[in-house]
Amino acid sequence: MPTPLTGRSALVTGANHGIGAAVAIRLAELGADVAVTYLRTGDPSRSDDYNVARSADGSGTTAAIESHGRRAIALEEDLSDPAVPARLFDQVESALGPVAVLVHNASGWRKDSYAPQRPDAVGRTSAMVDRHSIDSQLHVDARAGALLMAEFIARHRSHKSTWGRIVTLTSGEGRQFPGEVSYGAGKAALISYTLSAAAEMASDGVTANVVYPPVTDTGWITDEVRDFVAGDVDHHHIAEPEEVAEVIGWLCSSAGRIVTGNVIRLR
């Protein structure tokens, strides 16, 4: 039986674990063939669930995609390299056909601050803002996101396609982000790129939206984080990656065809 994304191919970045993996699997459930990217960034000397997940390759995700009868490839790439987006699209097109769905989930997260001595709401400290923290964050979140979208639309037009979906992920709404200032700046830039894409690609049949998940349990949640969420009126609960993936799957389906140019906050 045809499903909403039957015959379409998707590219999901940062998909060896967590939200990215859940999104890739959800798109496969909806019928898409899926390419996933990953970069093993965990500390191999640590055995906690979060580091184990961050140290994984993409084989677990591709196996889950294939269990739904869909084709899958996993590509280990460092998105801080500006040559990677074009190469990714070449590889995905060769293996799965033109990319109709782009989900940019990868992040170059580093915790930096102008007041690094002050612990944040859950007791974590930061490093001082420097060129390394700025480059790590902006190169992966903002620049890679912008180049992936540019590659997407250039190929979309060359194939004379009339249907496309772009979803990027943020943490915040483009305002201040104390304690993680370069993270906030990278996500603010990504929001701007995505909303501009929504305006400029609408006539090509492409929707573009930003999803702002709640605190999500991708393996990093501690008792301190749970206590913070429970006592904060701005947060309703700690989400599972699959809950976020359901929303992104809906945006990527035909049901999301008139939803574009939004920052969609989930709680």
What are the residue ranges of the model-derived segments?
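C-terminal substrate-recognition "lid" of short-chain dehydrogenase/reductases
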Residues: 4, 96-97, 240-267
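Catalytic loop of short-chain dehydrogenase/reductase
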Residues: 108-112, 118-133, 137, 157-189, ...
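A glycine/serine/threonine-rich, flexible loop-to-helix segment
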Residues: 45-50, 116-119, 182, 199, ...
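Conserved glycine-rich Rossmann-like NAD(P)H-binding loop of the short-chain dehydrogenase/reductase
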Residues: 32-60
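The beta1-alpha1 cofactor-binding region of Rossmann-like NAD(H)/NADP(H)-dependent oxidoreductases
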Residues: 55-56, 76-89
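Conserved glycine-rich cofactor-binding loop
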Residues: 16-17
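Short, small/polar-rich loop/turn modules that mediate ligand/substrate recognition or access, typified
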Residues: 202, 207, 259-261
